[in-house]
């Protein structure tokens, strides 16, 4: 694990390199393959409505309308904007003040914002990717959090999803689904929206696998959403008009077809050169071990070295090689503190459409070689 200060230095370094490339070569020399490339699709007529109170009134109504459609809500539900998904998670835990939070996800670890929020209200926190462990710990004093898709886009099994929700409902526990990427990627597996599965609350990120600004969209039962939103306003966690405008336009323009195309491209992406490189490097150092897997919209390199500390340092070094030499932006180097250090390549962005598979795989292979042969 990196310290907070080391995380800060990593982020500062990444931003400096991005700015240098932008100034020297222009925007076309950068390829955001993080899966969080986002966008800001507002219309010209939206600009006149960005005033604090006019914008809040107009765009909040639009976000509610299109957000409920996106997240599967009905007339008993409400949808509001926050300035990040993490902000919505914090506001939820501050408002509900649960005695304990039980978190089920497809693969450990969970997003750090959840445990950090629990510490603020002194809630006991437990996370597991074993459904049996989760079911045994749920009671009426529990806030049950379910992650639909991990930071590395591993998708929850639908039957386990339903089991946790049904058990929570039977024990009168509130169910909150962290569907940051899952609200969209789960659609590729024909999974229903979280609210249609019986969740009380769901949050999604408006920059993940869609062309919105970095923001959080919270939807669910009106009385719960109102309570959480009010708590969020006390700390300035709610989305302001410019952000709401970007979220509204992203929702209105959302098209699953781009994600479907990335899904098909990912299935056919040739990863054999990574396997070949792994064998070559292991002959030099038996501690080198490139662990990779396909994701629904690309692939992820989860490990390159057996020792955990060295592994994280090497993944970051590889990420910086990708950025400096090939203009490829990943969460590994540009992500917020606490984000996964796995090297994830996501093919859903417009930038991904500008480069072919050969460019990406060459960049990956050469960047790994550089990290281990320097």
From Swiss-Prot:
Q: Name one GO molecular function term.
A: L-seryl-tRNA(Sec) selenium transferase activity
Q: Needs which cofactor?
A: pyridoxal 5'-phosphate
Which NCBIfam families did the record assign? pyridox_MJ0158 (TIGR03576)
Q: What single Pfam family name could you report for this chain, choosing any that match?
A: SelA
Keyword Secreted among record annotations: no
Supply the InterPro entries for this chain: PyrdxlP-dep_transferase_arc (IPR020033), PyrdxlP-dep_Trfase (IPR015424), PyrdxlP-dep_Trfase_major (IPR015421), SelA-like (IPR018319), UPF0425_MJ0158-like_C (IPR055177)
Keyword Transcription regulation on entry: no
Q: How does it assemble?
A: Homodimer.
Superkingdom of origin: Archaea
- The name under which this protein is listed is UPF0425 pyridoxal phosphate-dependent protein MJ0158
Recorded family membership:
Belongs to the UPF0425 family.
**Alphabetical UniProt keywords:** Pyridoxal phosphate
N6-(pyridoxal phosphate)lysine: residues carrying this PTM: 208
